[in-house]
Amino acid sequence: GHPNCIQPGTRPRITLTPTLVLKEGKPCLAISVAGGDLQDQTTLNILLNFVEFGMLPADAVTAQRFATEHHQDSFDPNPNREEAFIEPGSLTVNAGLGQETQADLAKRGHTVRVKDGTIANPVMLYVDQESGQLYAAGDPAARRHAAALNTK
């Protein structure tokens, strides 16, 4: 049967990735992403944008993204599971990712697929623990919105 079937000997794979980041034991960042198999990858994309590249939520969720799609599609209704696999080594990138970067990825052996629309649908909320400032953002291209209310 299908890998996500609930039956003896299988380990269903789900894509839910609610993410809460703590700083000194207190919540400072929350991420939610809708998008099936792309959820984990998009969560990592925007978390790295925040942690490594210092982007605030509005920039982190709207920056160009990428996703590997060389695995079996969990949501493919095709009963022939062999046809549910995307081409090995394929990489989907946002159309806004620079041509030079796309060419470099292709040179490294990736089959680059350019997507005009969004890759998954992220929202992010950040609390600056020093100032108390709240930042909330959703990717408008994905029609996502985020809001926060400071009750202090």
Where on the chain are the PLM-derived regions?
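In a subset of proteins, long, contiguous C-terminal domains/tails are tracked
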Residues: 99-152
